[in-house]
């Protein structure tokens, strides 16, 4: 499983994620955050602010 530690990562909760994810200011996702911001896809995939490789989906369970 691909893991990326964002310096702005919040371990529990956050302004746009559920209890098993966390968000940075760019909408970065935790492992089971389901699509919470401009950098996230519907399966918890993340864009560049979460260490991903595309603007829509770079890391997450179904990317």
Swiss-Prot record:
Tissue: Testis.
InterPro entries cross-referenced by the UniProt entry: MSSP
GO biological process: sperm axoneme assembly; spermatogenesis
Keyword Electron transport: no
Pfam families reported for this sequence: MSSP
Keywords on record: Developmental protein, Differentiation, Repeat, Spermatogenesis
Keyword Heme on entry: no
Family: Belongs to the MST(3)CGP family.
Domain notes: This protein is mostly composed of repetitive C-G-P motifs.
Protein name in the entry: Male-specific sperm protein Mst84Da
Gene assigned in the entry: Mst84Da
């Amino acid at each position: 499983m691909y893991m990326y530690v964002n310096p702005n990562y919040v371990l529990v909760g956050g302004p746009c994620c559920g209890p098993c994810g966390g968000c940075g200011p760019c909408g970065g996702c935790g492992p089971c955050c389901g699509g919470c911001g401009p950098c996230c896809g519907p399966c918890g995939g993340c864009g560049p602010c979460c260490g991903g490789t595309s603007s829509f989906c770079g890391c997450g369970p179904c990317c």
